[in-house]
């Protein structure tokens, strides 16, 4: 089950003790990226998406239709 990911517990593939995350656009070096870090750049008339600082996921900005 070990994916070879250094953030991943080899048995459960959940974050190792003391680490925040295993993977995701807002996860780097096993830690969440700071709130306000751009995780998806805007295209056209869209707006940037930003990390929350508490999740490895990149949430959609609330203004997307």
Curated annotation (Swiss-Prot):
InterPro entries: Disintegrin_CS, Disintegrin_dom, Disintegrin_dom_sf
Motif (Cell attachment site): 43-45
Cysteines paired by S-S bonds: 7-30, 21-27, 26-51, 39-58
Expression tissues: Expressed by the venom gland.
Transmembrane segments: none
Major place of residence: secreted
CC annotations in GO: extracellular region
Stored Pfam families: Disintegrin
Compartment list: Secreted
Domain of life, source organism: Eukaryota
Keywords: Cell adhesion impairing toxin, Disulfide bond, Hemostasis impairing toxin, Platelet aggregation inhibiting toxin, Secreted, Toxin
GO MF entry, a single one: toxin activity
Signal peptide residues on this chain, from the entry's feature table: none
Biological role: Poor inhibitor of platelet aggregation. The disintegrin inhibits the adhesion of cells expressing the RGD-dependent integrin alpha-5/beta-1 (ITGA5/ITGB1) to immobilized fibronectin. Inhibition on alpha-2b/beta-3 (ITGA2B/ITGB3) is low.
Other remarks in the entry: Does no inhibit alpha-1/beta-1 (ITGA1/ITGB1), alpha-2/beta-1 (ITGA2/ITGB1) and alpha-6/beta-1 (ITGA6/ITGB1).
Protein's UniProt name: Disintegrin VLO4
Organism expressing this protein natively: Macrovipera lebetina obtusa
């Amino acid at each position: 089950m070990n994916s070879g990911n250094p953030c991943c517990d080899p048995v459960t593939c959940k974050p190792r003790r003391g680490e925040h995350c295993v993977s995701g656009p807002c996860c780097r070096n096993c830690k969440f990226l700071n709130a306000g870090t751009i995780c998806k750049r805007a295209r056209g008339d869209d707006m940037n998406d930003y990390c929350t600082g508490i999740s490895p996921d990149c949430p959609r900005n609330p203004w997307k239709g």
